[in-house]
Design a protein with these regions (language model features):
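Conserved PLP-enzyme active-site core in the AAT-like
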Residues: 70-293
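Alpha-helix N-cap/helix-initiation sites
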Residues: 66-67, 252, 378
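Short glycine-rich or small-residue beta-strand-to-loop segments that form or flank ligand, phosphate
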Residues: 37, 64-66, 151-154, 384-388
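Non-catalytic terminal extensions of PLP-dependent enzymes
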Residues: 1-39, 44, 56, 269-468
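Intrinsically disordered, low-complexity boundary segments flanking structured domains
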Residues: 50-53, 141, 198-200, 214-215, ...
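Long, structured ligand/cofactor-binding scaffold of large enzymes
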Residues: 17-21, 25-104, 110
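Short N-terminal secondary-structure initiator segments
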Residues: 49-63, 182-193, 201-208, 317-328
Length: 468
């Protein structure tokens, strides 16, 4: 046995490391040679018990713990489901790990093309892409392609759009479907997500459904904690070969323990309450921003959402509505997750119409960053925030306070030196006498001059030949 925890205490710098992380954390980082703990690679002992427990919690027939991230989980599922020489359908809005899978495997990809609005938000793959006629046309247009044996779909999108997975599972004519659900490991634990996740509902005859999740995203688990869930008949021995190919023989036991802990936190009514609190926190924040916008003198931030957000639900991206900015949206197809909050800044509407004046979101993101508020994603005029189970009222109010402080400072037209000191420090000569409104309008004019939103849409059409 390797006594790594004791080894740290053999040197001064090691003692500092030991004191920072604590003895229990380092003592838990044991060697795979500890037979009492079983094996992650062979799925024996406590590891097997944990995976069976997790499967029951997440509504799967079988679950696998992965200690090097969903990037690895995606490759495991792909290498099992799409053998060399086969053809697969793959979301053009896929994670880089799936692009790496294509580089590693001798497979033929048929791209499923998502829509995109002027804000830069991906709207999911339209229903027309999933029809037999559309898939057959892709096969005819792609050299070496055959009818696909597997499909990969990103659910949800980064911005929080979820598919009607019940329809997809019943409609898509392939033997196996993989939902890359890295950002939504919580969907099984609240009724508003019913029919919008891979493991939702009963098994589909003749199909196997895979769902990969980043347990450390949005839940309580250590970084690189990931899960593979399976529903349907599959070859366990062959699957485990792919699992072992991508799994270290020295897995991190603290990561394993954190995955099982995350499952335990979510089981039963206590888990539902955790997710319910996140949803309520996000809804309260959305309503407060809308209230401030209605009461504000002049401008204030807006939120990308329907007009009525009175109750906990996933809001449909319905055809004929302007708020989402997607042309030809399908009915009962895509839904907005309430815990994924996109803030809109002045300057452009959802249809891509530019105003004379505007506040590029990058300036707001910089202001918030200098105050310790993490922005998940920044577009030209939008910012994404995630309301995970770790977000409490204090943090939510901290974000709201940051937005109101930005408005106050912007309306006072403070100097960049005083409002964004870190930005000023990057080039004092350039920003010396500049005020925030001058900087904002200068960037906004450049965006208008070069027609950035339209250019981004053209890039999308050039890459995907997509009509947005």
């Amino acid at each position: 046995m390797l006594f790594r925890s004791s080894a740290y205490q053999k040197s001064p710098v090691g003692c500092l490391f030991y004191d920072f992380f604590g003895g229990n954390t380092l003592k838990a980082d044991v060697s795979i040679s500890v037979t009492e703990l079983g094996s992650l690679l062979d799925h024996t002992g406590p590891h097997l018990e944990a995976e069976e427990y997790i499967a029951r919690a997440f509504g799967a027939e079988q679950s696998y713990m992965v200690t090097n991230g969903t990037s690895t989980s995606n490759k495991i599922v792909g290498m099992y489901s799409a053998p060399a020489g086969s053809t697969l359908l793959i979301d053009r809005n896929c994670h880089k790990s799936l692009a790496h899978l294509l580089m590693m495997s001798d497979v033929v990809p048929l791209w499923l093309k998502p829509t995109r609005n002027a804000l830069g938000i991906l709207g999911g793959i339209p229903r027309r892409e999933f029809t037999r006629d559309s898939i057959q046309q892709k096969v005819r247009d792609t050299g070496g392609a055959q009818w696909p044996v597997h499909a990969v779909i990103t659910n949800s999108t980064y911005d929080g759009l979820l598919y009607n997975t019940t329809w997809l599972k019943e409609t898509l004519d392939v033997p196996s479907i993989h939902f890359d659900s890295a950002w939504v490991p919580y969907t099984h634990f609240h009724p508003i997500y019913q029919g919008k996740s891979g493991m939702s509902g009963e098994r589909i005859p003749g199909k196997v459904i895979f769902e990969t999740q980043s347990t450390h995203k949005m839940l309580a688990a250590l970084s690189q904690a990931s899960l593979i869930h399976i529903k349907g008949n599959y070859d366990e021995e062959t699957f485990n070969e792919a699992f072992m190919m991508h799994t270290s023989t020295s897995p991190s036991y603290p990561i394993v323990a954190s995955i099982e802990t995350a499952a335990a936190m979510l089981r039963g009514n206590s888990g539902k309450r955790l997710i319910q609190r996140s949803i309520e926190r996000a809804l309260d924040f959305r309503k407060e921003v809308q209230r401030l916008r209605e009461e504000s003198d002049g401008w204030f931030f807006d939120i990308w959402q329907p007009e009525a957000v009175d109750k906990a639900e996933c809001w449909p991206v319905a055809p004929g509505e302007d708020w989402h900015g997607f042309k030809d949206a399908d009915a009962d197809h895509m839904y907005l997750d309430p815990v994924k909050v996109t803030i809109l800044t002045p300057g452009m509407d959802e249809q891509g119409n530019m105003d004379e004046e505007g506040i590029p979101a990058a300036l707001v993101a910089k202001f918030l960053d200098e105050r310790g508020v993490v922005v998940e994603k920044t577009g030209p005029y939008n910012l994404l925030f995630l309301f995970s189970i770790g977000i409490d009222k204090t943090r939510a109010m901290g974000l709201l306070r940051g937005l109101t402080e930005f408005k106050r400072a912007y309306d006072l037209n403070l100097r960049v030196k005083n409002m964004l000191p870190d930005l000023y420090a990057e080039d004092p000569d350039f920003y010396r006498n500049m005020r925030i409104q001058d900087l904002a309008q200068g960037i906004h004019r450049l965006i208008r001059q070069h027609q950035l939103p339209q250019l981004m849409l053209k890039i999308g059409r050039a890459s995907w030949r997509e009509r947005v």
